[in-house]
Curated annotation (Swiss-Prot):
Belongs to the morbillivirus protein C family. Coiled coil: none annotated. Residues 1-10 have a biased composition (Polar residues). It comes from Rinderpest virus (strain Kabete O) (RDV). This is Protein C. Pfam families: Paramyxo_NS_C. Disulfide bonds: none annotated. Residues 1-37 are annotated as: Disordered.
Amino acid sequence: MSTKAWNASRLSGPDPSTPWSLKKPLQHGSRPPKGKRLTVCPPTRPKQTIRISASHASQQLDQAKAACLAVTIRDLEEATAVMRSWEHSLVTPQCIAPRYSIIMFMITAVKRLRESKMLTLSWFNQALMMVSKSGEEMRNLRTAMWILANLIPREVLPLTGDLLPSLQQQEPPMLKQ
């Protein structure tokens, strides 16, 4: 044990935690002694560049586009449901055989997009063959597909198949010929 006692009011001996440079009083005009500074830094790894392959980046882009397409399809479903209720409130049943309107074709196409995520030219040709007896329904089908092609953002349009990108580049179809 040490013979020197520590007192809270004054020190009876040197403080062991005081650095050596502060233990000796400095003379007027002199500089503190230059000692070797020991800076202990933990060893660090060199910075590494994170590399992302082109296929991984394109895969992430495709996933983002697919998510955007899913949101667009959901929004189109909601919009066509509103348009359908609006159309039914305005139109009274006048004939026995109901005809497909532009809105009905849009609803059918959006349902197909939701189920299979694709609208192909072969599907469009089959639909045209089914309504080939009615010139009005053919125009309605073309108009509905053209409207859909222009409602879906261009970035995700190629994900919908080959029909809508080809229709988007065309002129708007005439409603009455």
